[in-house]
C-alpha cells in the first residue's frame, strides 16, 4: 500500500486553487484535435467534489442555450491547464444536486461576502 501512495504523490498537482461547492470556476482544458491543440474554457458552478488524492474529481454545471451541461473533471488531470476561481458561493451543502431542478433566478447562488 505504501508503494501506491508514493506513486500517487508523484502525480499530484500543486497549482490547484482552493475551491468548493458553490464556487464559480473557469476550467481551462487542453483539447487536442489531430496535430493541433487549443485551450477551451468551461465556466460554471461547482456542484460537488468527491474522492481524495489522485482520484479526486469535481463536477461543474453551467446552462448553455437553456440546456444544463455538467462536466466532471479529475482535479489532478494533466488535461486541465489551470483552474481559475471567479466567485465564491455562499452555500450550506457539500453537494448542490438540487440545482438540476431549478430554473432562472432560483438557480442563482449568493456570493460570499468577504
UniProtKB/Swiss-Prot annotation:
Species annotation: Clavibacter sepedonicus (Clavibacter michiganensis subsp. sepedonicus)
Entry annotated with the keyword Acetylation: no
The gene behind this protein is rplS
Q: Which Gene3D superfamilies match?
A: 2.30.30.790
Query: A single GO molecular function, which one?
Result: structural constituent of ribosome
What's in the GO CC field?
cytosolic large ribosomal subunit
As for what it does, the entry says: This protein is located at the 30S-50S ribosomal subunit interface and may play a role in the structure and function of the aminoacyl-tRNA binding site.
Q: What lineage, starting at the top, does this entry show?
A: Bacteria, Bacillati, Actinomycetota, Actinomycetes, Micrococcales
Q: In Gene Ontology terms, what is a biological process of this protein?
A: translation
State the superkingdom.
Bacteria
The entry's protein name is: Large ribosomal subunit protein bL19
Q: Which family does it belong to?
A: Belongs to the bacterial ribosomal protein bL19 family.
Q: Does the keyword Ribosomal protein apply?
A: yes
* InterPro entries per UniProt: Ribosomal_bL19, Ribosomal_bL19_CS, Ribosomal_bL19_sf, Translation_prot_SH3-like_sf
Keywords from UniProt, A to Z, are:
Ribonucleoprotein, Ribosomal protein
Amino acid at each position: 500500500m505504501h508503494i501506491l501512495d508514493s506513486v500517487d504523490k508523484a502525480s499530484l498537482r500543486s497549482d490547484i486553487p482552493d475551491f468548493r461547492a458553490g464556487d464559480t470556476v473557469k476550467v481551462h482544458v487542453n483539447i487536442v484535435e489531430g496535430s493541433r491543440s487549443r485551450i477551451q474554457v468551461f465556466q460554471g458552478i461547482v456542484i460537488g467534489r468527491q474522492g481524495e488524492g489522485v482520484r479526486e474529481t469535481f463536477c461543474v454545471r453551467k446552462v448553455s442555450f437553456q440546456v444544463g451541461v455538467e462536466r466532471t473533471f479529475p482535479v489532478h488531470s494533466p488535461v486541465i491547464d489551470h483552474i481559475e476561481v471567479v466567485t465564491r458561493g455562499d452555500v450550506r451543502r457539500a453537494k448542490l444536486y438540487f440545482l438540476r431542478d431549478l430554473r432562472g433566478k432560483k438557480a442563482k447562488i449568493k456570493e460570499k461576502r468577504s
